[in-house]
Amino acid sequence: MLASATGEFTQTKGKETMARLLGEFDDIDVIVCQNDDMTFGAIEALKEAGVKTGGVGEPVLISFDGTRKALELVKEGVINVDVECNPNSGELLAQIINDLEAGREVDKAYYMEEKVFTKENVDEYIEDRNY
């Protein structure tokens, strides 16, 4: 690993951070962004530096969230992999909190379905993506 840096979960900071890292390192093989907004910023910085992603011999770009915009970039081959972080889990969490506050018993474990999106499977999911 060459470096670990934060883009503070924003597109602007993601772009700034990626631009700085591109200035520090000549050969970046893999870029992992912990959310799609930082990835969008990183993509801007990469484009401005003339660096393409996703293809053979190009940096691999991995993102987290699974937003529709990111899935479109997966389909285009700009992002190699996007791992879902389902925003709909908040409703379940609110129900669990309400149940606990009401003194009701809740399950000890809950599992949310998450997906991993690649160019090979993204077409199955992109049309139904509502976030």
Could you describe each region identified by the protein language model?
Residues 1-131:
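A residue-level marker of the well-folded mature domains of exported/periplasmic proteins
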